[in-house]
Amino acid sequence: MVHTQHFCAKCGSASIRRNGSKKGQPKYQCTACRYQGLFVPAAVRKAAQYAQVDALLSERNSQRSIVRLTGVARMTIAKRIKKAALPSPPLPPRRSTKAQRKRWEVLELDELWSFVGRRKRKVWLWLVVERARRRIVGWTLGSRGEAPLRKLWQALPAHYRRHCWLFTDQWKAYAKVLPRWQHRPCPKGAGQTSIVEAINCSLRQRCGVLVRKSCSFSKSLAMHTARIKIGIDNYNLTL
């Protein structure tokens, strides 16, 4: 049998007794200082619930399924998703600057189809992946034209734009945006974009809004962006 010892949160005394309940949670009263409180404070319970919500968001669960699993209100889950849409800290370099100058990196680029609201409203996810470390170093959402790709290219750090070979498929937007002397377009089946295509599959397994035939789709671009950001951040953290 396991016995749990509780102490007063104010004076630290072990002489406490049960004193009713509040919203289904047992209360206690300290016989030394007469302080009343909960054995498990609400902040601790909410922190555990929010940690569970954050874990479920990165495991292909919809908002309503998380409500059924955790009992957390759907509006609270939506607030957690919007909070996760804040800018992420930059990825730390895995090698020194001197080592980066000696050896060129290899980046793989690809685009991933998704939709917002209805299937006719297409939104493409553009990814930039380091081949050696298999981490996502850049991404953006938009159409399949040149504008989102140009925005993504300009947002990449300078050492990626100057000292990298760029392997892509033969989609026409890449040839118009990427530098010709760095760009290496490859036909389907060549295997030069196998890493980024495998990461596309991993993201579809982790993020429900990227699944082709799913009821877990986003109704707004802001929520769509936030859900994808959660999936990408969690993927990079697992490397």
Label every model-predicted segment.
Residues 1-239:
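Residue-level recognition of single "structural anchor" positions
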